[in-house]
Amino acid sequence: MDSEVQRDGRILDLIDDAWREDKLPYEDVAIPLNELPDPEQDNGGTTESVKEQEMKWTDLALQYLHENVPPIGN
């Protein structure tokens, strides 16, 4: 039947109790500061990292607006 789960026996050979219980120590995980969410979320509770927030501006290319302004007058 389609509604029954078909288990793949090949994966069972790769996973044992020692592998399942193995944990990565917390102090070995190094996350760059720009990848972490803003710790002071006063304006709404966004979970975006600083890098993701900065990329919003580059997605729209707004940082180049001031460079492409035509001269006034003449």
Swiss-Prot record:
Q: Which InterPro entries match?
A: Apc13 (IPR008401)
The family annotation for this protein states: Belongs to the APC13 family.
Pathway in which this enzyme or protein is active: Protein modification; protein ubiquitination
Q: What function is annotated for this protein?
A: Component of the anaphase promoting complex/cyclosome (APC/C), a cell cycle-regulated E3 ubiquitin ligase that controls progression through mitosis and the G1 phase of the cell cycle. The APC/C complex acts by mediating ubiquitination and subsequent degradation of target proteins: it mainly mediates the formation of 'Lys-11'-linked polyubiquitin chains and, to a lower extent, the formation of 'Lys-48'- and 'Lys-63'-linked polyubiquitin chains. The APC/C complex catalyzes assembly of branched 'Lys-11'-/'Lys-48'-linked branched ubiquitin chains on target proteins.
Q: Where in the cell is it found?
A: Nucleus
Region described as Disordered = 33-53
Organism domain of life: Eukaryota
- Under which name does UniProt file this protein? Anaphase-promoting complex subunit 13
- GO CC terms of this entry: anaphase-promoting complex
The alphabetical list of record keywords is: Cell cycle, Cell division, Mitosis, Nucleus, Ubl conjugation pathway
What binding partners and quaternary form does the record give? The mammalian APC/C is composed at least of 14 distinct subunits ANAPC1, ANAPC2, CDC27/APC3, ANAPC4, ANAPC5, CDC16/APC6, ANAPC7, CDC23/APC8, ANAPC10, ANAPC11, CDC26/APC12, ANAPC13, ANAPC15 and ANAPC16 that assemble into a complex of at least 19 chains with a combined molecular mass of around 1.2 MDa; APC/C interacts with FZR1 and FBXO5.
Sorted alphabetically, the Gene Ontology BP terms of this entry are: anaphase-promoting complex-dependent catabolic process; cell division; protein branched polyubiquitination; protein K11-linked ubiquitination; protein K48-linked ubiquitination
Q: Where is the signal peptide?
A: none
Under Pfam families, the record lists: Apc13p
The transmembrane residues are none
